Amino acid sequence: ENKFDEFLMAYRYSASLVAPDSYIRYYLDSKMLRYYTKFFARKIRRSKDDIWRNERFKAMGEILKNIHPRLLNKSSRYSKKMIKAGLNGDLELAKKTVSRHLAKIKFKKILKNKNEMNKYLYRHKYINKPLEENTVMFETFMGKSYADSPKYIYEYLAKNYPGKYKFIWVLNDPKEKLPYEGKIVKRFTREYAYYLGVSKYFVFNIRQPLWFRKREEQVFLETWHGTPLKRLAFDQEEVTAASPTYKAQFYRQKQEWDYLIAPNKFSSDIFKSCFMYDGNMLETGYPRNDLLSLPNRDAIALELKKKLGIPLDKKTILYAPTWRDDEYYGNGKYKFKLKLDLDLLKQQLGDEYVVLLRTHHYIADALDVTGLEEFAYNLSKYDDITEIYLISDICITDYSSVFFDYANLKRPMLFYTYDLDKYRDVLRGFYIDMETELPGPLVYTTEEVIDKIKNLNSLNQEYQQRYEQFYERFCSWEDGNAAMRVVEAVFK
């Protein structure tokens, strides 16, 4: 706020040192005029502080009286109107001129950009259309996949309420095939904006777009996408790779969530804190984990192995690492360098095992498994990680929340935490003590990973009691009926 006074003081002082018709004075005046029409004008229109429309507007009027005449003649039509308003002290003319100018700029931007045009249509047209009472819109991971809890809620609705609902799925791949009668729309297209405006129900596993404005009659179900291990949102002291306004944005977005799913009591308590959420918490378990409790899960796993080309005579090791907050290309695009020595794993375990690789959807780097064909299978692009759990005999992870879900299977887990101290103490911090509460050992080298896998029997015995305690704490709500409970609560 003090910069205005400093700017005027600097201008007046500099102008007093040079001749009125000099080139330097002409330059100073051009800078002042640009400041007035570009920056100051916006303050007249948008600032909550009336000082911009009173004392400062009058001060600018006095400055304009001494601006070089040639500049006034060369100015644009908009600038001339603003100068006239300033010279005459006509605040209403100034506000009107600025409003029209900003609207013109915005409209030009809309015409040049499809996304902006779609947002404009959403705000001014689609959001005012009659609500489609039985339309349900689903989105997972920004349209990257048909997966997670929205998938299982969708399939439960489609199977148990045939013909009742119209289903809209946000998927960026138009070739994606959906079961039942779901309609695919691409994220941020005109159709996407339309259904944001008219759908009655929303089932998202991530935050909604910032420009979305939930209508009073609409129902927003936020499933989220994992039991929290790493500190989230308002529990983070510093947000490394996200937008500087991340927390402010998050606060506004969570205000529109009518329901939030919790997979366990631990998550319910954390979500209330880290999201500052005081809405309807559905303590149902995660619908995505219903698959892990099906009585025919082994038969499903066999068919999945055949579909993916995984050898039926080999055991499978799933390696599912998460991203590192300080290794990124930009917002939501993270680097990842594979630290697990796959060549050594193949040499030591290749006769009995194959490895399934699955990175987090935020990771932008593709994994290179050249030369490891028929041993390492990169399933990072496979939509549904829950299906990958089913075909995995062992899970290796780090700080990913996958282990909370995988524990439903009560199969062995290893935690390859080669950078534990950095991740825990510098980057994020954890909600649980990884050294005393995890249902498996922390390992720091590929050699340790191999040793633990070769000695699974003793490993299982060593961690049996801790695993049982972990299961009771984090998996006891998940009995295969979470989707049913969610649907009964939300789709009344």
Regions found by a protein language model. Give the residues of each.
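C-terminal alpha-helical cap of glycosyltransferases
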Residues: D479-K492
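Conserved catalytic-core segment of nucleotide-activated headgroup transferases in glycan assembly
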Residues: S145-K159, C274, P287-V369, V443-T445
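Catalytic binding pocket for nucleotide-activated donors in carbohydrate/polymer assembly enzymes
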Residues: T370-E374, S401-F474
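C-terminal subregions of glycosyltransferases and related glycan-biosynthesis enzymes
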Residues: N2-N115, K159
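Nucleotide-sugar donor-binding/catalytic module of glycosyltransferases
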Residues: E1-E6, D405, V486
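A donor-sugar binding/catalytic signature common to diverse glycosyltransferases
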Residues: F202-R231, Y382-L427
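Donor nucleotide-activated moiety binding/catalytic core segment of transferases
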Residues: V185-Y201, R207, H361-F404, E437
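Active-site and donor-binding regions of nucleotide-sugar-utilizing enzymes
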Residues: T135-P295
